């Protein structure tokens, strides 16, 4: 009784000054038009209320105890002899003031409940139970994780330090059951009764990406405690937390406006049968934020009934101001998705000086002795790929990272993708190509040789188009060293794929680093492919003279579809040339045999273009101070969230030693990495397990490396929301996927925007650690839902809006099945291509071998005799 009185006092809508009146308990009903309260009101006021209490018009909503105000009999009269009573102006003013007080009290109580929930989630002292449990993953293997049980939620961390968040389980939608097991310990299971997701998208501190663990199921979790006593304690604690889970709905649901019928969770048919309702989803809206700002915004998300237009407009303006003030916190501009990899902006960046100063270096006496020791082992023309270079010539970053220097001006490609003129597109592509060379280290430095299986990923945010360019690279071969990379920005309409084989040659006083390979730039909306090649790096003055690093060679940028080609020649400094003759470049743009323009200048400074028909040259490209300030900001993965073979984490100790000037320690750390690579190679050789890249595959026909998850389909603004990356996999978040995921979280919306039960689809993959959501998903139709109303069954389908009609749902399911079939066929074709060469060779060998005769073996003669005997027996029976 005390608890009921406390809850009634806590969620009451009436102002403290009003006193409830006695009503007949047989004539009570719940007010389902206001979410968050369960106050009881009389069904037929007038008889049980005070004699002088005026009855309210029907459009004013159900009467409340505080609205039954005493009015003198003279202040009301009959309306045209009917049974309805008219409310006097005095009573109407009193009702309006009382309703305002109720709404203000409602907001304060809801805000207080929200703060209590936020405090329970973030306060480390509010813990029901915390201990280590083994959790079974999707691959049937067990992982020991730290579980923290709070009211309504189960927080899972990687370690007891509560720093590496893995996921959050929402207990309000879960059932608990003991699970028999033949293994030691005590096993129990948390599951969703309708096989939907039990995970929250964000953590208690707003984390969008969890720590990397083995994949966990989306609709259930199987736990194992060390002993039966510990397991029983967890069962009791979980049952207690399940009783408290109703408080979590204040944070998980985004209630609609109370002025519209059916927006209350208690009033909706879906909530009455235990199923969540859907809501309209904005593309940039968080799917399930569990941070302070979003929970505070929930306190202002509900609106009471509208008395008049003026009050409605005022409340809407106040609500929008409160929402804006609390929703733009911890929000990166243009963040496309909340479930992708976490990226942080790189603050420091070394660009180097323009001109010859950054390409010349004087070697110290100590380093000269190391160089002489190394040169004694070399012969002219020798390949340097297997030679271990001293660490003082190393640039403190991997070669995979260095290949990303070409995308700091990827906004030029965004402009080229929407350019209608083919010649102008070629010039923009050429300008982007030149923008990747002026960033150079101070002095003559060589990046790290990537370890086999090493990966690097980063992205650049485009503020003009609110998009991101993602860069994924992997070392797919060690001998020869091959680096494969993929760049994608589907929203802006371009992607780049390619591979580079690094080769080096020693020529006595000089050496050259050759970048053998090509890259293919594709404009998705036009299906245009531009093939690009790379110059080589030439270092001279090793034995005598000044050590200088230059770029040389001829490169081409060619588009076969529109027949445009750009040719560039990087010129080495001549023997008697001055400072102006270094880094020279010349080239031309042609269309077939016709020369359209010629270029000249310096690749790290000004480049001029002279078009045919014009008598003067114009500035084509210059890395001026303004251009440098317009560089896109690179975002990389935080070090603690990187995998073991990601570049920055892999080489962190070598980089730290080089930055401190400790060459001895850098050499030791570098040797340890190389020795570990050799050990892994020996283990693979002993186990006869060939190396298989994680993100790229080799086309057996063209012998080119391709990204496994590349998507060349044009961007669809009506369906596609944002492109995101998770674990090196690039995917696209779509409207249907967001609407389905929000449906699982139980977000109620206005009645005319609420989707029916058949629209609730279960996602194929919904992992707590930020595993990417595929746009393809399997369907799941609950059977225990109430039927849709006529209002919900009519109308066209709008993503995130009204419910689709049965015909649209049937067509969507048919298209989904067709799409999945096409994907499976494509995967089978890729697998067939992969083994094509092996099959052809085995077929050739089989053709050369002599084919045995049909009746050369005794077994064949025996079978023939048995067959003839059976035939004779059958003929005898039939006669």
From Swiss-Prot:
Keyword Chloroplast (UniProt): no
Transmembrane residue ranges: 860-878
Subcellular location: Endoplasmic reticulum membrane
Segments of skewed composition (Basic and acidic residues): 300-309, 316-325, 750-765
GO biological process: cholesterol metabolic process; cholesterol transport; Golgi to plasma membrane transport; phosphatidylserine acyl-chain remodeling; phospholipid transport
Modification type Phosphoserine: residues: 12, 747
Any single Gene Ontology cellular-component annotation: cytosol
Coiled-coil annotated residue ranges, if any: 93-123
Domain PH: 126-243
Chain residues that bind a 1,2-diacyl-sn-glycero-3-phospho-(1D-myo-inositol 4-phosphate): 384-389, 446-449, 478-479, 670, 674, 678
Entry membrane topology: Single-pass membrane protein
Biased composition regions of type Polar residues, renumbered to the chain: 766-783
Tissue expression pattern: Ubiquitously expressed.
InterPro entries documented for this protein: OSBP_sf, Oxysterol-bd, Oxysterol-bd_CS, PH-like_dom_sf, PH_domain
Misc. remarks from the entry: According to a report, the gene is imprinted in placenta, where it is predominantly expressed from the maternal allele only. Not imprinted in other tissues. According to another report, it is not imprinted in trophoblast stem cells.
Its job: Lipid transporter involved in lipid countertransport between the endoplasmic reticulum and the plasma membrane: specifically exchanges phosphatidylserine with phosphatidylinositol 4-phosphate (PI4P), delivering phosphatidylserine to the plasma membrane in exchange for PI4P, which is degraded by the SAC1/SACM1L phosphatase in the endoplasmic reticulum. Binds phosphatidylserine and PI4P in a mutually exclusive manner. May cooperate with NPC1 to mediate the exit of cholesterol from endosomes/lysosomes. Binds 25-hydroxycholesterol and cholesterol.
Protein name as it appears in the record: Oxysterol-binding protein-related protein 5
Organism: Homo sapiens (Human)
